[in-house]
């Protein structure tokens, strides 16, 4: 697989090495790796939560999913025996994994979504928020975190984010780290201490953009929850049954609307009306991937 060629003639392995080294060196767009923690710094609205004008989930600082995916990239390069002139990829990966401790909120039982700071600030000096989002699931589903923290975080996700067919992008609970959303005319669009939006309806800039990643449920995250169940309880037969049941909650959607497809998003509040595009590749391919995994 890694010998396959990308569009520019490089192998996929060469592309992966290029990504890792570009992050470590810093990119012209402001992405950088903190030398101390090896966590990835992201400028405002650079992640998949990228709504802008207004920026409704800016997440400037160290987002948790970037840390996990970077750790997995480094571990994969180490497993493939790729060498470099500086610190080995395996050592860098270990530093990222150790630094995930900066995200864990023992007082809340789940991982902070982002360590907030401006560019040039080390992760150790950033502020961990208390925003419960599904991004932390990657740490569990990819096997980066396997201890009691995984079980606690998974439980929090189940209590506050899980809905039929998807996971809420933000828990419907108050926060202490404020998330103010400011409109194009400088007006405050939300209650910064209660930033959850339960429905994805209304005007695009003042209602739908703020709701898009702040409560709206996303279908592509549901399989990650099922996968995390299996990772966390690998010897529990009930976990596999529960994972199948979770994915099975999408059966109705497959038989309605755009037949054989799954929607992009749905309202975070019941009855969880389907929203966004009728056929979302993220949703379909992730469900298929994990369903096939459950069958093995």
Each PLM stretch: what is its role?
Residues 3-11, 74-90, 232-237:
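Inter-helical turn/loop segments and adjacent helix faces that build the functional surface
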Residues 180-235, 239, 288-293:
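C-terminal substrate/ligand-recognition segments
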